[in-house]
Amino acid sequence: MTEEAATSKILLFNKWDMSEVVVKDAGMVRYVTITSTEVPSSCGRLTQQQFTKSEMAIVERLINRLMQQEYNTGKKMMCTKMVMDAFDVINKKTKQNPLQVLVDAVANAGPREETVRLKYGGINVPKSVDSAPIRRVNTALRYIALATWKGSHKTKKPAYLVLADELIMAAKGDAKCFSVGKKEEVERIAKSAR
C-alpha cells in the first residue's frame, strides 16, 4: 500500500477502521451498512423514501435511536459523544474493533421470530411469524437504546458506560443483558404461538 493510500483511508471518529468489519449473519448483510465516514451523519437525506434507512451507516442509526429516548430527544451531538466514549471503553475492555462488537451485538439482539394477532371469528389468536432482516436490525437497535436509557436513568453510572457494557454483553450473546434477554423472551412467546 502506498503512503498516499494509507493517509487517505477514512476512519470513523478518526480512530476506527470500518474495512475490517464483517457481518457474520447472512440475512442482515444488506441492512447493516458499514460506510467509511469520519462522522456518521446523513443530515436526513436517507429519510425521504421508505426503505432508504437501510443504506444509512449502522453507527448513525444507533445514534439516531439513542436520540429518541426521553431526555436525549434531538441532542445528536450528545448522543454522538456517548457513542464515541462507549467505543473507547469497548476497545479498552475487549481489545477489538468496537464496530465489530456493534455489528455482532445487533446480530445477537434482533429477534428472528415474532408474533402477530390474527382475528378468527372475533377471537384474537397469536400466530408466530419470521421477522424481516430490516425489522431485526431496527428491533435490536431499539432494545440496545432502551437498555442504555434504563441502565443510566436515576443512577450514577454514565450512559456511555452502560452502552459499552450492553454492546459487549450483547456481542457475546449473554442473556443477562437487556437486549438479548428481550430477544429471547420475544422468541419464546413466538415459539409457544406456533
Swiss-Prot record:
A single GO cellular-component term on record: small ribosomal subunit
UniProt key word rRNA processing: no
InterPro entries from the UniProt entry: Ribosomal_uS7, Ribosomal_uS7_arc, Ribosomal_uS7_CS, Ribosomal_uS7_dom, Ribosomal_uS7_dom_sf, Ribosomal_uS7_euk/arc
Domain of life from the UniProt record: Archaea
Gene Ontology terms describing biological process: translation
Keyword list, A-Z: Ribonucleoprotein, Ribosomal protein, RNA-binding, rRNA-binding
GO MF terms held by the record: rRNA binding; structural constituent of ribosome
SUPFAM superfamilies per UniProt: Ribosomal protein S7
Subunit structure as annotated in this protein's UniProt entry: Part of the 30S ribosomal subunit.
Family: Belongs to the universal ribosomal protein uS7 family.
Cross-referenced NCBIfam families: PRK04027.1, uS7_euk_arch
PANTHER family from the UniProt entry: RIBOSOMAL PROTEIN S7
Record's protein name: Small ribosomal subunit protein uS7
Gene: rps7
